């Protein structure tokens, strides 16, 4: 099926390009997400008329993605899963589960935007997940899979302590630089 892209999509092409995709992908993902439209003569003419508006809309989406990316910077998620003694969890962690957790924390991100990097999360531990907020904005977040609420609480406390010490170090470095600048 031939479609016209209404925004830049890294795996397909740029805004306004006519590309061929499988009909199910177009019907079930691209059209409902308003990322593409059918490639008809009428739509091609309409696209040329709307090109500036679409580029402006794309710029707004990019700016919104950058703002969201800054709030997600250094973000981590803790998931509690039942696991065997050797650390294998029962089932696996999915992008839908991660998206649901992000939603509970106030971030409305589609599971389609999450990338596990081709791995399956089936063990306790730390994992890196990429969130594609825009074709030009990809944010990494850290996922911790732990066995119990107690482990999650300990991890949160350790992370908060680590962030406080990093912040104090940064403040000390800034005050030293200011003092050095005053001495010059």
Swiss-Prot record:
Keywords: Ribonucleoprotein, Ribosomal protein, RNA-binding, rRNA-binding
Presence of keyword S-adenosyl-L-methionine: no
Record GO terms (molecular function): rRNA binding; structural constituent of ribosome
Pfam families: Ribosomal_L9_C (PF03948), Ribosomal_L9_N (PF01281)
Protein name as it appears in the record: Large ribosomal subunit protein bL9
Lineage: Bacteria, Pseudomonadati, Pseudomonadota, Alphaproteobacteria, Rickettsiales
Biased composition (Basic and acidic residues): 173-184
InterPro entries: Ribosomal_bL9, Ribosomal_bL9/RNase_H1_N, Ribosomal_bL9_bac/chp, Ribosomal_bL9_C, Ribosomal_bL9_C_sf, Ribosomal_bL9_N, Ribosomal_bL9_N_sf
Record-level GO BP terms: translation
């Amino acid at each position: 099926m031939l479609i016209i892209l209404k925004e830049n999509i890294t795996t397909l092409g740029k805004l306004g390009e006519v590309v061929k995709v499988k009909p199910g992908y177009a019907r079930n993902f691209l059209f409902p997400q308003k990322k593409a439209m059918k490639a008809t003569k009428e739509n091609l003419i309409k696209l040329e008329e709307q090109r500036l508006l679409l580029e402006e809309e794309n710029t707004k989406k990019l700016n919104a993605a950058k703002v969201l990316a800054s709030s997600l910077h250094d973000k981590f998620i803790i998931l509690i899963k039942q696991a065997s003694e050797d650390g294998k969890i029962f089932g696996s962690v999915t992008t839908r589960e991660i998206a649901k957790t992000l939603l509970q924390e106030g971030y409305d991100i589609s599971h389609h935007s999450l990338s596990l990097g081709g791995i399956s999360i089936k063990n306790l531990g730390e994992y890196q997940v990429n969130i594609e907020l825009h074709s030009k904005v990809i944010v990494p977040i850290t996922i911790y899979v732990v066995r119990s609420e107690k482990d999650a609480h300990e991890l949160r406390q350790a992370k908060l302590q680590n962030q406080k010490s990093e912040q104090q170090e940064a403040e000390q470095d800034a005050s030293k630089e200011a003092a050095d600048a005053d001495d010059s």
